[in-house]
Amino acid sequence: MEQPKGWTWQDRAEGSIRRGTALDPSLEPVDGILAFPTAYLPQRLLITRSEEDQEAYDQELRTLRDAADTFGWQLEIESDTGRARELTPGVPGFLRAYLTTPDEPIRRESPVAPDAWRVLQRARRMSRSTMPRTSLEHVLSIDPVGLNPFTRTNPFTRTNPFTRTNPIRGAGAGGSDDYLAPGRGARQPVSWLGPAPQRGPAPKRGRRPVVAVLDTGCGMHSWLPDDIVTRHVELDGVPVGLTDDADPERYPDLYGQLDGEIDAVSGHGTFIAGIVRQVAPDADILSVRVAGALGVIDESSLLLAVAQVVELLRRHREDPSTGFPIDVLNLSLGYSHETPTDGLFSLTLYALLAKARALGCVVVCSAGNDAIDRPSFPASLWAWPGADNGIRADHDAPHVSVGALNPSAHSVALFSNVGPWVQTYAPGAAVVSTSPAFVGGEQAATRADLDGLRRETLDPDDYRGGFAVWSGTSFAAPYVAGRIAAELGTVPIEGVSADAAAKAVAAVAKTLPAPRDRG
């Protein structure tokens, strides 16, 4: 199976190294702060910084260093980078703080490994404040069914949790794991018999709507040529998103065992782009790769990519000859925050998405696949009924959170997250869309050639036909994003108003099923 040039066993073995750790809320409890499990990087913190509150930033940094010192750890701030400045006008930048152990034990004993959660909680106790500028650096995951391991009790007990494409065989497994079985919603090849989406002529006035997809990139497919999908964009000469050779839309088996098994999210971005293409054939697509084949993303990396995309949008709104037009932003990824109430969470992602919406861009997020009602970020970053997140309603372009429906459209998929923060539901189970022409290591169960003909049963991971079935709220979100783009139709060169965006969202919402318990 093809590999990137220079790919070594060290690169492949990286897939067995867990990214992040599970938060234990019982450590360093602080009165008034109710915490829940999440996944985070134990050696890093994110600190918001703006020129207007430099004194408060300096004080918070001193407190963090004092808190780290009580454990025998050191806290170092990364050298000043573009992240320290405004990410886009009106959104403060941030710096990453690294926790390390000293070269020489300070108290004649070797300290335990650094833990950002314990430092943050102790700093809160020492300062008698919530430390509003400081947050953990969370680990986000892409959202096909079977990949969100962070909300389970023991999320890291398997050495390679991400490398099993179809782990369930035979009869249905029961519960939400039933969707992991071939023929029950798991990824598998399928034949497409209809015509390709038909694209109309370019508008004489205005332009086509643009859907931006921040995901694993977009592979090559006859439905997704370069005049429809932009796969590379720069901001001030700097590429937006990941550009390394480890492209999961080109190389299907980068991590884990040398068995040819397709990585769990390889092809994920191509599948999403194909959904947008089906429901909005006249739309253009901007594909930004923010995740690799393991399907996980560091929060700071996502923040930077979102900031770049929002800045491109802002510049285009000010001067259509610059930047890049974006009318709908699709985010099929998420995480659960440890303190999601009363504004005790990192506001940077919310501020960036709010900025995009203020510029007339609709934000569409997948709800997640944990089969729970716990609010997921960024899907729940809006003023939903009964919300205690401190977010106020506004009149900007809408923020839309999307759960998944079963093929019947009469029931919500069991794996889909639910709750008052999920605004709508759309097809997300056993969905058909585009796939790169991957050929995995599994073979047909039976082969019997005759008269020069190759005869065999279905090869479970041969995607050379270009299409697949797959499940996840990941795929419900782009359905809605594409429908909104199609409803917008031809748009002004500079973009649409927030009012026009809201009307398009409302029109689409009226046509989506509203499943209810009918007894």
Identify the meaning behind each predicted range.
Residues 3-5, 25-41, 45-55, 59-188, ...:
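Autoinhibitory propeptides
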Residues 130-132, 208-210, 281-284, 324-328, ...:
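Loop/turn elements at helix/coil->beta-strand transitions in domains of secreted/extracellular proteins
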Residues 211-213, 286-288, 327-332, 362-365, ...:
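Structural recognition of the beta-strand scaffold that forms the well-ordered cores
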